[in-house]
Amino acid sequence: MTFLIDKMYNILPPELWIKIVDYSGEINLLLVDTNFFELFNLVDAKIDVIEYIVRNNLTDILKYIVVLKTLKHPIINKNFVPTKSLNKLLIDNCEKRRLDIIQYLINIGADINSKKNRAVRLASERGYLEIVKYLVSQGADVRANKDYAVVWASRNGHLEVVKYLVSLGANIKVDDNFAVRWASRNGYIDVVKYLTSQDANIRADNNYAVRLASENGHIDVVKYLVSLGADIRADNNYAIRHASRGGHIEVVEYLVSLGANVKSCNDCAVKFASKNGHLGVVKYLASQGADVRSENDYAFRMASENGHLEVVVYLVRQGVNVRADNNYAVRMASENGYLEIVKFLVSQGANIRSKNDYAIQKASKNGHLEVVEHLVNQGANFKSDYDCAIKLASENGHLEVVKYLVSQDADIRVNNDYAIRWASRNGHIEVVKYLVSQGADIRADNDYAVRMASENGHLEVVKYLVNLGANVKAQNNYAVGWASRNGHIGVVKYLVSQGADVRSGNNCAAIMGF
């Protein structure tokens, strides 16, 4: 093969090969043989050659470049080895864990200290010990950027990297003992133990380590920190409050056994646990004296709002008021589409019509058809507040809810045909078509529907309305003016084809160049 390449090289004179490469921009040819490679001195390469070589994993060529650099070959003076590119490639290959490429890049001039020693920091952060050691051997500063390397190696649980960096003098106590705080937060017990053996302060930042280890459920770390004197009641019993929030029952039980106050911060622990659906924690806290009814039955209300049926049932059995805060629970369960909770609350006496039938209005707004149907069956007034339910369902594009409400005699034309005007404004073509089939007036409010559909770029709606007789020139050619202002060129062109005047009114279309 080498013979054939050499023969090919000799077919044409070098100056012709140079023209071929310059014209085509194709550098592959220059990478097949040393004869061709020499032409780099003469061609005007339009791409980053080193990046190309690294991206295509052409390690043999990198080796060859290293040899040329050692020999001080004239080609090395050619600017196809830009330092900026080398530095970027060095960092990229630290991330990819390519030690072989890293070595070649450094040998041909990459600066390991570029970007505040980003290479060694990144290798430490990722736990690539062999790369960290090599970079250090080449002069990397492991303490750059406030000991970033050891901090992030600790944060990510890379014990061997941490030990190595400490052996080189890295400061584990920098930034108020960030290393042990975040190793604790992330549950890396071996790193935590090592850092404390090196005199890290576990009580830094108001006992951050034990607080965050508790919050994230790392029971082994919590126990270890407590054995060293960490204060579990710091920051108003943060540890138990947030362990409860995360549903970490084992941590919660352990903290209570050590005297954590389950009622701190107005019974935040049980409120958080209820809000997030952690039934086991809720039951345990209640057994330890937590008040499930604090703050106007907050725990029950949040459990209902967030769809945690088992918690809701349990709290109701503990005597909470299902109608607290003007029936907040059933209103928010309806708004968020939690049908089973709605049914249960109704069975317990919740008033679905509170706050002017808020429940059915918001269920309609969010498209929760089954909830809407159930509420109607329970006597909700879907016509309250000027048929707000169907207006909101139409505005938000919930066709099946719209159809159901119409079947129950909702008025689609209320409020000057609000439903079709806002369905058009928001581009809900299927709702628009259905409302038209039910007798909605597309020209209501001075052709509001086509004007707003145009303004918001809903071409399909615009075409449909125009086909039904909507006036594209209404209100001094509002439609084309605002479609232009908002950059909806497809709508603009269509409106112009239908006779819209681009020079009327404030000349928006003309200003935009149409």
Curated annotation (Swiss-Prot):
InterPro entries: Ankyrin_rpt, Ankyrin_rpt-contain_sf. PROSITE patterns: ANK_REP_REGION (PS50297), ANK_REPEAT (PS50088). ANK repeats lie at residues 45-74, 84-114, 115-144, 146-174, 176-204, 205-234, 236-264, 266-294, 295-324, 325-354, 356-384, 385-414, 415-444, 446-474, 476-504. This is Putative ankyrin repeat protein R863. It holds the Pfam family Ank_2. The lineage of its organism: Viruses, Varidnaviria, Bamfordvirae, Nucleocytoviricota, Megaviricetes. It comes from Acanthamoeba polyphaga mimivirus. The keyword Cell cycle does not apply. Keywords: ANK repeat, Repeat.
